[in-house]
Amino acid sequence: MTDNDDRIKLEASWKEALREEFDKPYMKQLGEFLRQEKAAGKAIFPPGPLIFNALNTTPLENVKVVIIGQDPYHGPGQAHGLCFSVQPGVPTPPSLQNIYKELNRDLNIPIPNNGYLQRWAEQGVLLLNTSLTVEQAKAGSHANAGWQPFTDRVIEVVNERCERLVFLLWGSHAQSKQKLIDPQRHLILKSAHPSPLSAYRGFLGNGHFSRTNKFLEQNGKTPIDWSLPDL
């Protein structure tokens, strides 16, 4: 997994911003780990071309909002590199169902029949998991594989290079990244995680989507159209 590896397609602005990371020992070790896992016959999600989908879909200069997830969905056909999102034709996972419930409550947005969040990413919502790969049926299996320093650097880059972003930190894992964000430059919104285990302890009712758009408009930015088409 080097900058010259033709299998790693990274959007130009991110490639420039993260160039040094790809030369660091941890990243080379991560690449070797993934190669060994695949060689051992393990199913790794998402597929290789989609590992950096969040960065490739939302160029650095387009970022307005950052949503921090944990690791990809670990079922076949679900993950495609955007946190909380699933590919078309896959049932909407429980956490995303609660995100839709809050969107409906907060902004009266209809609940779509799918969990495909590509349209958010194309508008500047960086849907970043802190681990970008996972082994099939083993949640969190790559949490210590080496992704954390890389995705921490992604958060640091958007913190440093972008102005007046909104960071949505849902749950303790996402909130552990708050230390990487300057609250004088950006709006940080925190609540419980949308998981069914915690959604009723402060996620539902948090008003984060309307508050995000109000902040963007106050800072001269086009608000996010959170509505999603049925597929």
From Swiss-Prot:
Entry superkingdom: Bacteria
The protein's enzyme class: hydrolase
Subcellular localization, as worded in the UniProt entry: Cytoplasm
Keywords: Cytoplasm, DNA damage, DNA repair, Hydrolase
Record-linked Pfam families: UDG
Active site: D71
Iron is among the record's keywords: no
Family to which this protein belongs: Belongs to the uracil-DNA glycosylase (UDG) superfamily. UNG family.
UniProt-listed HAMAP family: UDG
Name used for this protein in its record: Uracil-DNA glycosylase
Species per Swiss-Prot/TrEMBL record: Pseudomonas aeruginosa (strain UCBPP-PA14)
Gene this chain is encoded by: ung
